């Protein structure tokens, strides 16, 4: 028999087991999960009793009969007084229990496996130590355990033998004392003669009773003296001495009696002789009984629920009972992750422990077959029974409170895993057509509805992540304040406008924009800010939106006027210069090297340029302004020199 693991399973022949039971007049069939003790009367080890314990396995986990029944070996001591036993040779029992063999270590001794020898017990009386054949099949550790158990049993047997020897010696001593009464000398139990009549002279006499006459006189009995054998030694009923006159009272004779003259002349009392003959022989004291205490099976270890660990993950339940079902449904996966729940009983204990015994919310194992049934039961108890056609209103309330994902989970729990119904209701509460389309495209790639129901939450979270939405289906841009960034380039992507150094009306076509144009620009800017505060998808903004769609000012308009009005302090620090002759001519503009930000050039100006007002863009424009002013001074000096040469 293999001994590598604690539980060993082998094939079982049920028909052969039924035949063995019938041969022993046991009119019943074996049961699934029944524990049987086997008493092996003989085997390859010899004609010595050995014991084994097995458990029958006739059904699977679904209570369906097995095609090939099995039995497993239980590593526990057999207790024949409390267990169902089957006795027989090893060869006969192996017909039903295939590969049956002896257990490991001292378990083969059965009720003596714990080392307690019980006096008078038939199983203890049949104890025999291990044989050489058994020793050859044992390992070193197993042999040490067996020898330790054998030594304990044999020490108890030696103690009992010594006790029997002491009792035997006591009985022999009593017999020797009894036999010594037939020899010379007064033994402690030998009879003694009555005292002479003179010893009763001073005692009061009893009154005579009419109708009762004294006993007939008889010759006095000789007293026994040392060295002489009394003539009435063999007489069991010796005659008593007669006394004249009325009957004398019976006197108790003992060493402290003052009426007894001498110890050697004590009279023999007939009543004492008769009482001594009635006394039974001394019964030897019973040896101390060593009561056999059967080894109880180890109690089943109850599952310890780490309730504090679970509460540290889920938190405390809400105080409002109507919020408990949603809270439990949301935390059910977390509870399974911390402590896997396998049985309804365990699930019921966990839920009742978490809820803390709220009135009316204690569940039974029948209500906790699954997490869905538990949540549905709590929801009905806290919200009342609702018809199935009102499930949409229930899910809508959950969507408003917890979001689409939680509403889908609880909807599946309340509807009994009806995916078609719940998905149809949830579809109407998805945040936007883009989410509906992307989610449906992902769900269509699944095999069946069961797979879709299991992966619905995963696909929903993936779509939310792609579209820039949080777990509640809301835009993540609503909580982020846009921060403008300075741009170093001078192309179309430049978002910050630099201050102009020249006068506002220098050059052709550089008139101040109309009031309607500025109002339209400000309204467009306010509209863009409103769009940032509203919910929506975090899509790429349209940077090059045309002006007719509200994208900004035309390419001919400059922001110099707005910059001068918004920052009068910057313009006041600079000294205005007079207009140069011919500064509005395009030819002179192309000949004079000037920066694009200082003069509103046609080629380098951003058509969608917005008015600056942020703090960080102001810092950048301060540096640019100094560089632009120095460049404009040099260019104006060159223009003046060229004009003087022409006049000369």
From Swiss-Prot:
Q: Name one GO biological process term.
A: microtubule-dependent intracellular transport of viral material towards nucleus
State what changing residue 17 to S does: Complete loss of capsid egress from transfected cells
> Which intervals of the chain are annotated as region GR-box 2?
535-556
Amino acid composition bias (Low complexity), ranges on this chain: 230-249, 525-534, 624-642
Query: Motif PTAP/PSAP motif: which residue numbers?
Result: 284-287
Concerning PTM, the database record says: Specific enzymatic cleavages in vivo by viral protease yield mature proteins. The protease is not cleaved off from Pol. Since cleavage efficiency is not optimal for all sites, intermediary molecules are expressed.
User: What is the recorded phenotype of mutating residue 171 to G?
Assistant: Drastically reduces infectivity
Positions of the UniProt region annotated as Involved in viral assembly and export = 37-60
Q: Where is the composition biased (Polar residues)?
A: 495-504, 514-524, 559-592
Q: Mutating residue 50 to A leads to what result?
A: Complete loss of capsid egress from transfected cells
- Report residue spans for region: Disordered: 175-275, 476-648
The annotated regions of Basic and acidic residues compositional bias extend over 262-275
As annotated in the record, motif Nuclear localization signal runs over 535-556
Sites marked Cleavage = 311-312, 339-340, 352-353, 621-622
| GO molecular function, a single term | RNA binding
Annotated Gene Ontology cellular component terms? host cell; host cell cytoplasm; host cell nucleus; host cytoskeleton; viral nucleocapsid
Chain segments carrying region GR-box 3: 586-618
Q: One Pfam family this chain carries?
A: Gag_spuma_C
Domain of life, per lineage? Viruses
The role this protein plays is: Involved in capsid formation and genome binding. Shortly after infection, interaction between incoming particle-associated Gag proteins and host dynein allows centrosomal targeting of the viral genome (associated to Gag), prior to nucleus translocation and integration into host genome.
Domain free text: Gag protein contains 3 glycine-arginine motifs (GR-boxes) necessary for RNA packaging, the first of which has nucleic acid binding properties in vitro.
Tell me more from the record: Foamy viruses are distinct from other retroviruses in many respects. Their protease is active as an uncleaved Pro-Pol protein. Mature particles do not include the usual processed retroviral structural protein (MA, CA and NC), but instead contain two large Gag proteins. Their functional nucleic acid appears to be either RNA or dsDNA (up to 20% of extracellular particles), because they probably proceed either to an early (before integration) or late reverse transcription (after assembly). Foamy viruses have the ability to retrotranspose intracellularly with high efficiency.
Protein's UniProt name:
Gag polyprotein
Q: Which gene encodes it?
A: gag
């Amino acid at each position: 028999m293999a001994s590598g693991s604690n539980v060993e399973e082998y094939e079982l022949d049920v028909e052969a087991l039924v035949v063995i039971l019938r041969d022993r007049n046991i009119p019943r069939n074996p049961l699934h999960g029944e524990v049987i003790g086997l008493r092996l009367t003989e085997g390859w080890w010899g004609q010595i009793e050995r014991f084994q314990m097995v458990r029958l396995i006739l059904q699977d986990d679904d209570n369906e009969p097995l095609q090939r029944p099995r039995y497993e070996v239980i590593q526990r001591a057999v207790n024949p007084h409390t267990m169902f036993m089957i006795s027989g040779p090893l060869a006969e029992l192996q017909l039903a229990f295939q590969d049956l063999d002896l257990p490991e270590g001292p378990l083969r001794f059965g009720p003596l496996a714990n080392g307690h020898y019980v006096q008078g017990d038939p199983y203890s009386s049949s104890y025999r130590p291990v044989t050489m054949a058994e020793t050859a099949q044992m390992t070193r550790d197993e042999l040490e355990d067996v020898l330790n158990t054998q030594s304990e049993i044999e020490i108890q047997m030696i103690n009992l033998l010594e006790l029997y020897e002491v009792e035997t010696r006591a009985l022999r001593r009593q017999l020797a004392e009894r036999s010594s009464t037939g020899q010379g000398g007064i033994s402690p139990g030998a009879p003694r003669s009555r005292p002479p009549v003179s010893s009763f002279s001073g005692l009061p006499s009893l009154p005579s009773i009419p109708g009762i006459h004294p006993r007939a006189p008889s010759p006095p009995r000789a007293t026994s003296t040392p060295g002489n054998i009394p003539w009435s030694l063999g007489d069991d009923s010796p005659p008593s001495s007669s006394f004249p006159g009325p009957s004398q009272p019976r006197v108790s004779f003992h060493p402290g009696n003052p009426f007894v003259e001498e110890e050697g002349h004590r009279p023999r009392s007939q009543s004492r002789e008769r009482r001594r003959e009635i006394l039974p022989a001394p019964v030897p004291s019973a040896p101390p009984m060593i009561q056999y205490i059967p080894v109880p099976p180890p109690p089943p270890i109850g599952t310890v629920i780490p309730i504090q660990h679970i509460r540290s993950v889920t938190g405390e339940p809400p105080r409002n009972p109507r919020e408990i079902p949603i809270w439990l449904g949301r935390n059910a996966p977390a509870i399974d992750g911390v402590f896997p729940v396998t049985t309804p009983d365990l699930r019921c204990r966990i839920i009742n422990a978490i809820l803390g015994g709220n009135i009316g919310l204690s569940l039974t194992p029948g209500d906790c077959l699954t997490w869905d049934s538990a949540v549905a039961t709590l929801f009905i108890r806290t919200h009342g029974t609702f018809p199935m056609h009102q499930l949409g209103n229930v899910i809508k309330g959950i969507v408003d409170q917890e979001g689409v994902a939680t509403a889908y989970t609880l909807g599946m729990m309340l509807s009994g895993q009806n995916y078609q119904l719940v998905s149809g209701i949830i579809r109407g509460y998805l945040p936007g057509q883009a989410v509906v389309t992307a989610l449906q495209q992902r769900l269509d790639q699944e095999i069946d509805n069961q797979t879709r129901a299991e992966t619905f939450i995963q696909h929903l979270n993936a779509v939310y992540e792609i579209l820039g939405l949080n777990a509640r289906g809301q835009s993540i841009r609503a909580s982020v304040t846009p921060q403008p960034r300075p741009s170093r380039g001078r192309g179309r992507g430049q978002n910050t406008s630099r201050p102009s150094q020249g006068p506002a009306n220098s050059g052709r076509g550089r008139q101040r924009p109309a009031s309607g144009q500025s109002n339209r620009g400000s309204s467009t800017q306010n509209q863009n800010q409103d769009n940032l505060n509203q919910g929506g998808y975090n899509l790429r903004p349209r940077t090059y939106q045309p002006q007719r769609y509200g994208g900004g000012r035309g390419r001919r308009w400059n922001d110099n006027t707005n910059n001068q009005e918004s920052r009068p302090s910057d313009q006041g620090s600079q000294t205005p210069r007079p207009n140069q002759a011919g500064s509005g001519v395009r030819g002179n503009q192309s000949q004079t090297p000037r920066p694009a930000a200082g003069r509103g050039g046609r080629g380098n100006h951003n058509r969608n340029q917005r008015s600056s007002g942020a703090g960080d863009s102001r810092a950048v424009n301060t540096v640019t302004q100094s560089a632009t002013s120095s460049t404009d001074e040099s260019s104006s000096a060159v223009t003046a020199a060229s004009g003087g040469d022409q006049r000369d």
